[in-house]
């Protein structure tokens, strides 16, 4: 029937996108809150959506952070999310629904760019490699979870995916242009990827030096002009945010203040956790197809160069994951095609076993991540049961630094009678002298306040004998206190601490 034919064509074109999008959407709905790494873009999206042109009400003017960040990514996401947010506001739903909408929009943007890359994989390597690429991506928790997190690295990832797609397509100059935009506007460290790719293209005579120079300089000037124009307005001063980030992290080497890892950490911890079964297969992919090293070597060089920086996080190299997945998909396709041969049959069985292990690791990792936002759950619980609807007075909630870093953003705030303070550097002994009704903090006891309940957070994974072999260990992370002078009009029985 015609309808069935249309549905079949739709699924053939967008089926893989629906799979990846559904997995990413589940992660967002189940764990909608955000952490300190995302705070700037999250607060910026909130302010663009709710305060619009009233810049004086924007969060970044009160809490500017260590270095300025660009508003361009927040603007793009907010423009696409605004119709949904308007409906949410009209229906009177909590603002956290708007956060979910914004994160879903970001996920759609990133997965749309991944779709472009995937289509080029299909054209260059075939349908089967494309299928394995989707399978690997869907089994990797970190990539699909991160693609909805409003981090500068993820905003840059969208442009990197477009660069990868053009690279595979043979459009080398546009590929370099996308990488330059990502470097200048979102993440200056993308230059560590731009350099190896550009050098390889020059050495293989895939591009002309002078033509590439014209492209790169023109694109860089356009990107610099755009970010300075937009961000100077938003920050109310002349600023190129990503240059200041580069100066702070690379020249002053201040990023080490947030901790350091060994030089091999990306290869012995970050990549194995993020790639799972694709990690060993990505190495095999470079051996079974002569086309793969052309794409893998620059990306591998990117990770090696990044390893020189002391401060390391998985999100810094998240843009390498799609290309490693391509190499792994090529290897998996070769193994599958030769599965009837004796040796390859054994390799195929091992690969299938690792697929199952990867799925299990993804479930465990998601469960751990679910409990990484105790402050968000604590504030939600307070809103649900902490205040009667007929009381006219304001209810002040103080959120300490730990609380603000682990789940709470302005999207988590409710309207009157709730008021919020994130005032920093208040010693615990001074809190009783302030006009705070409730406290959300990391202290189990505060003078002048009664602890109503606590929220547990992820502590560690523990191996045990028996079933299940892996146990999620949780620990009390965030406590909610109420001023002792404040009477509970409903006489609720709080669980206490």
Swiss-Prot record:
Domain of life: Eukaryota
Additional free-text comment from the UniProt record: In the absence of ALG12 activity, the N-glycans transferred to proteins are aberrant, indicating that the oligosaccharyltransferase (OST) complex is substrate-tolerant.
Top EC class for this record: transferase
Major place of residence: endoplasmic reticulum
Disulfide bonds: none
Name by which UniProt lists this protein: Dol-P-Man:Man(7)GlcNAc(2)-PP-Dol alpha-1,6-mannosyltransferase
EC number: 2.4.1.260
GO cellular component: endoplasmic reticulum membrane
Species, as recorded: Arabidopsis thaliana
């Amino acid at each position: 029937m015609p309808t069935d034919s249309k549905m079949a064509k739709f699924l053939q074109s967008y089926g893989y996108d629906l799979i990846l999008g559904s997995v990413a959407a589940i992660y967002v709905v189940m764990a909608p809150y955000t952490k300190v790494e995302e705070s700037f873009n999250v607060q910026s999206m909130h302010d663009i959506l709710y305060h619009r042109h009233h810049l004086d009400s924007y969060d970044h003017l009160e809490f500017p952070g260590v270095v300025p960040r660009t508003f361009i990514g927040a603007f793009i996401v907010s423009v696409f999310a605004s119709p949904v947010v308007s409906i949410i506001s009209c229906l009177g739903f909590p603002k956290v629904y708007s956060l979910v909408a914004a994160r879903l929009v970001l996920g759609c943007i990133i997965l749309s760019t991944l779709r472009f890359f995937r289509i080029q994989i299909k054209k260059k390597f075939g349908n089967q490699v494309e299928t394995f690429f989707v399978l690997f991506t869907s089994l990797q928790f970190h990539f699909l979870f991160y693609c909805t997190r409003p981090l500068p690295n993820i905003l840059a990832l969208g442009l990197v995916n477009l660069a990868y797609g053009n690279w595979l397509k043979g459009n080398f100059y546009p590929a370099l242009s996308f990488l330059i935009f990502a470097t200048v506007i979102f993440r200056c460290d993308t230059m560590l990827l731009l350099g190896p790719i550009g050098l390889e293209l020059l050495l293989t005579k895939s591009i002309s030096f002078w033509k590439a120079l014209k492209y790169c300089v023109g694109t860089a000037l356009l990107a610099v002009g755009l970010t300075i124009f937009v961000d100077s307005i938003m920050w109310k001063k002349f600023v190129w945010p990503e240059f200041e980030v580069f100066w702070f992290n690379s020249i002053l080497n201040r990023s080490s203040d947030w901790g350091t890892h060994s030089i091999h950490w990306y290869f012995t911890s970050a990549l194995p956790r993020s790639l799972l079964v694709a990690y060993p297969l990505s190495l095999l992919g470079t051996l079974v197809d002569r086309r793969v090293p052309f794409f893998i070597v620059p990306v591998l060089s990117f990770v090696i160069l990044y390893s020189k920086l002391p401060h390391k996080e998985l999100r810094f190299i998240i843009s390498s994951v799609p290309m490693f997945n391509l190499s792994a998909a090529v290897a998996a396709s070769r193994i599958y095609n030769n599965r009837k041969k004796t040796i390859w049959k054994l390799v195929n069985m091992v690969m299938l076993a690792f697929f199952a292990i990867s799925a299990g690791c993804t479930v465990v990792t998601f469960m751990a991540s679910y409990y990484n936002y105790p402050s968000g759950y604590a504030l939600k619980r307070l809103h649900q049961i902490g205040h009667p609807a007929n009381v006219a007075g304001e209810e002040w909630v103080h959120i300490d630094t730990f609380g603000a870093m682990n789940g709470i953003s302005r999207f988590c705030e409710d309207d009157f009678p709730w008021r919020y303070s994130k005032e920093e550097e208040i010693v615990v002994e001074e809190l009783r002298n302030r006009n705070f009704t409730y406290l959300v903090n990391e202290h189990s006891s505060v003078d002048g306040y009664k602890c109503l309940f606590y929220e547990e957070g992820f502590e560690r994974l523990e191996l045990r004998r028996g079933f299940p072999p892996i146990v999620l260990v949780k620990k009390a992370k965030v406590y909610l206190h109420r001023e002792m002078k404040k009477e509970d009009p409903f006489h609720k029985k709080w669980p206490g601490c």
